[in-house]
């Protein structure tokens, strides 16, 4: 049975990191991931993902903050999506209404649902 890993915020970033570490996860749901984290952009440029499917999401107001590091979230999620696509990963990026703290359970559920839909009917447990 295919495994899916996912999470919200820092757990979303961990899920993305895991996608670069192992092929044990056929799909990853990185919901509002902390891609603004120091050197994450450098890391993804130097590594290849090992998963087949990645769901990304971000609130459309998350970059509207006084914190200069958090303001980079929108640009970095776009760069993350582009990098995954360049590497041949089936990737979607969904923009949600609101900031980082709105509807996190529903957003995460949508991510796992998307992953399950991508894996429906696939028999091999690893990519």
Language-model segment annotations:
Residues 1-49:
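Primarily recognizes the serine-hydrolase "nucleophile elbow" in alpha/beta-hydrolase
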Residues 18, 41-43, 69, 106, ...:
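A generic "cationic amphipathic patch" detector
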Residues 19-20, 32-33, 55-66, 97-98:
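Cell-envelope and extracellular/periplasmic
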Residues 38-40, 64-66, 103-105:
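Extracytoplasmic/secreted cell-surface and envelope-processing proteins
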Residues 51-52, 89:
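A short helix->loop->beta-strand "cap" motif at the edges of active sites that frequently abuts
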Residues 57, 75-127:
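C-terminal catalytic histidine-bearing segment of alpha/beta-hydrolase fold enzymes
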Residues 63-75:
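Short, flexible/disordered intra-domain loops and linkers
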């Amino acid at each position: 049975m295919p495994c899916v890993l996912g999470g919200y915020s820092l757990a979303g970033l961990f899920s993305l990191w895991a996608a670069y570490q192992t092929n044990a996860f056929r799909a990853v749901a990185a919901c509002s991931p902390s891609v603004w984290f120091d050197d994450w952009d450098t890391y993804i440029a130097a590594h290849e993902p090992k998963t087949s499917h990645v769901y990304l999401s971000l609130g459309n107001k998350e970059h509207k903050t006084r914190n200069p590091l958090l303001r980079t979230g929108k640009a970095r999620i776009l760069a993350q999506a582009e990098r995954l696509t360049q590497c041949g990963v089936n990737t979607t990026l969904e923009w949600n209404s609101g900031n980082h703290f709105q509807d996190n359970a529903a957003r995460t559920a949508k991510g796992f649902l998307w992953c399950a839909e991508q894996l429906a009917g696939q028999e091999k447990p690893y990519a």
